[in-house]
């Protein structure tokens, strides 16, 4: 069976870019965050292999980036190399794959956003027990 991309949502913050790979009941999860790309793979609840490789719009700090798995998705928070520089898109190339969408539920203006961003990162870090 041929692998397919996972539906992916993303949003931008002053220090981080957040990505959510929307896969329920995932198994065999692998997330590799490098300075210029992320490689994600897993199997969904039906055993279908999912694979995404994303070349980032800009360089990231892979050593200060994390991922968190839940029953419904795998979320990555990727530390930007240059903070407070807006990313107009997630990908290096100016293309929009059908599986990639902006997460408008979490997208907001940056003004006064540092505390919100810190709270999100701390929430994921605290909830690390089920990784």
UniProtKB/Swiss-Prot annotation:
Gene Ontology molecular function: any one: Hsp90 protein binding
Family matches, as SUPFAM superfamilies: HSP20-like chaperones
Family to which this protein belongs: Belongs to the p23/wos2 family.
Lineage, uppermost ranks: Eukaryota, Metazoa, Chordata, Craniata, Vertebrata
Provenance organism: Mus musculus
Start and end residues of each CS domain: 3-91
Protein name: Putative protein PTGES3L
